[in-house]
Amino acid sequence: MRMAAITKMLFISFLFLSSVFLARSGEVDDESEFSYDEKSENGPANWGNIRPDWKECSGKLQSPIDIFDLRAEVVSNLRILQKDYKPSNATLLNRGHDIMLRLDDGGYLKINETQYQLKQLHWHTPSEHTINGERFNLEAHLVHESNNGKFVVIGIVYEIGLWPDPFLSMIENDLKVPANKKGIERGIGIIDPNQIKLDGKKYFRYIGSLTTPPCTEGVVWIIDRKVKTVTRRQIKLLQEAVHDGFETNARPTQPENERYINSTYHSFGIEKQQ
């Protein structure tokens, strides 16, 4: 009986320690661990020192970068993006540092015969990538993941204009609901990612990383050359929905470190939405 009691106590202790470990490991998604304040101890320059599993944030293949298009190499075999997006059940999630739209089955992007499922999209204000040194008002990230855990992210930049972004217009009312409450999820029904209107003909491509901790490297980045328009009101809705201090949630540009930047089209400058 005594041995059974000891065994029971050890088992209970194991469960307690396991729960502590799981609670700690789940803290990676806590945005209070990092900030975008460049003067803060947990600001972007120090992300790689905050946690051992964030050390890649100090790596050599980090994103975002400044894309100087005269240095981009035109690659003739870069094809029009092979995407097969489709309407999907969608959930809007406030992650504290940004607003994410998660898709149950939004279709896929195919690169070199590998399918990358469209998992989610989110927004950064201002833009994270710059083009020829110019930073824009907003950047959307369409995050795709393959079956073996590799990422492709499509970045679309926006400037303030007279015309609202049609895709954001579809979810404007839903953006008001999870305001300033981290972890709030809300199903918003069927969303069609094709409404983003990405033609996929002219883009830059390079190898980089995720732009938030853990800053995983080896990410294929595709930056659309066309600058879309968004209204001040739409940007304000995105900023008001996140936690205080994350209204500006763009990581500074990182060293290029002589990486190859490929392009499907040779020209100087960017294309404006007509």
Curated annotation (Swiss-Prot):
Q: What is its EC number?
A: 1.6.5.4, 4.2.1.1
Which amino acid positions bind substrate, per UniProt?
T211, T212
Keywords tagged on the record: Glycoprotein, Lyase, Metal-binding, NAD, Oxidoreductase, Secreted, Signal, Zinc
Name the Pfam families on file.
Answer: Carb_anhydrase
Q: Where in the cell is it found?
A: Secreted
Which cofactors does this gene product need? Answer: Zn(2+)
Q: Determine the domain of life of the protein's source.
A: Eukaryota
UniProt-recorded Gene Ontology molecular function terms: carbonate dehydratase activity; monodehydroascorbate reductase (NADH) activity; zinc ion binding
PTM notes: Proteolytically cleaved to produce a shorter protein, nectarin-2.
Q: Where is this site: Cleavage?
A: E73, V74
Q: Where is the Alpha-carbonic anhydrase domain?
A: 32-265
Binding residues for Zn(2+), per the UniProt record? H122, H124, H141
- A GO CC term assigned to this protein in UniProt: extracellular region
Q: Which residues form the active site?
A: H97
**Record's catalysed reaction(s):** 2 monodehydro-L-ascorbate radical + NADH + H(+) = 2 L-ascorbate + NAD(+); hydrogencarbonate + H(+) = CO2 + H2O
Q: In which tissues does this protein get expressed?
A: Expressed most strongly in nectary gland. Also at lower levels in the ovary, style, stigma, floral tube and at low levels in anthers/filaments.
GO annotation terms (biological process): one-carbon metabolic process; regulation of pH; response to oxygen radical
This molecule's function is given as:
Bifunctional enzyme which has both carbonate dehydratase and monodehydroascorbate reductase activities. May be involved in regulation of nectar pH. May also regulate nectar ascorbate concentration, protecting floral tissues from free radical damage.
| Family designation | Belongs to the alpha-carbonic anhydrase family.
- Read off the PANTHER family from this record: CARBONIC ANHYDRASE
What's the protein name?
Answer: Bifunctional monodehydroascorbate reductase and carbonic anhydrase nectarin-3
Q: Which species is this UniProt entry from?
A: Nicotiana langsdorffii x Nicotiana sanderae (Ornamental tobacco)
